[in-house]
Amino acid sequence: MKKIYLAVFTMALLLAACGDKKSENVRLSGTLQGMADDTVYLYGTDRYYNRLDTIFVKQGKFVKDIEVDTLVSAWLQFGNGMEYPLYMDKADLIEISGSADKPGLLAIKGNPANEELTRFHQELFGKDLPSEAAVEKAAEAFIRSHPNSLASIYVLDKYFVQKSVPDFSKIKELSEQMAGSLKDRLYMEQLLEYLESYEKVSVGKSASYFQIPGMDGKDIRRTDFKDKYLLLYFWASWSDACRETSRQLKQLYKEKKNREKFDILGVSLDVDKEVWKDAVVNDTLDWKQGCDLKGWNASLVGQFAVRTLPYNVLLAPSGRIEGRNLTQKEIEEKLAEIAKKK
């Protein structure tokens, strides 16, 4: 009888221990305005390929458990194409609130890096829209005061690396302020590798020879645009932002292609030839189109250090890089400036 009681008592202890064991999963929960029933994608550091999970939003709310082994950087990508960084560690209870239309003002509780970035954005953008100089000053102060925070890598990337004309000396100076543990993170390693590539094709540098298969299968070469200013326009059929930018470029192309010795070469990141061709036809894009069907591994993506879509690089007839990631207004101003020099 004593053996039976002992066995029952031991089993009860085991069940109690199991019941008290804290889950090491991350619990994500949130309320998002402007998202009744939608989908949010969760990506790892390589947000082009490394999808971690899919979050289904119902009536603006969601709850999701995510399994992680250590502190990780991730990305929330919303249905409108907007994205926002997220930091998760084992057993974190993370609450997200705000509007999917304004991810820069999301409030994220749980994990110090999330809360630090939330405070930074709310203090900076919570009231009036700050000037570019004010944003850069605040971003620099954040990095210097948070040398151990994963959020500092994002701030460096967003507000310094992604500028149309990055200040490489400033970026290197700020990266040196970061703790060694941050420099070993994959996100930071990728960022430094990108900077090395970008510096070789920054404004003022010369673009090397390139070619890309056209819609008819024949190669399109840089020499096909002799004596013309060429806008390399990186896009993809699956990006709504790209399709909208293409529509805006059509009017510019119509006005400038003959008068300013200006041309456009569309460089698609599609991987399906028929889908790519259908998009070109449906959007009635008149300029030449090239695609090697390799997505983000496309040769010109690496050659010109492209990380976002839509994106553009303006080349002079000599091959000199005149501008990167220009707005339509900046393209028009650059062409007007060039015309005055003739």
State where each predicted segment sits:
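N-terminal "domain-start" segment that seeds a small globular fold
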Residues: 189-222, 287, 334-341
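Thiol/disulfide oxidoreductase modules built on the thioredoxin-like
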Residues: 285, 292-340
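Bacterial Sec-dependent N-terminal signal peptides
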Residues: 1-30, 340-342
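Hydrophobic beta-strand anchors of alpha/beta hydrolase catalytic cores
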Residues: 231-232, 264
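Conserved redox-active cysteine motifs that mediate thiol-disulfide chemistry
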Residues: 226-227, 234-251
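N-terminal targeting signals for export/organelle localization
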Residues: 18, 132-203, 342
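Structural microenvironment flanking redox-active thiols in thiol-disulfide oxidoreductases
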Residues: 243-283, 295-302
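A non-transmembrane, solvent-exposed segment enriched in polar/low-complexity residues
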Residues: 18-142
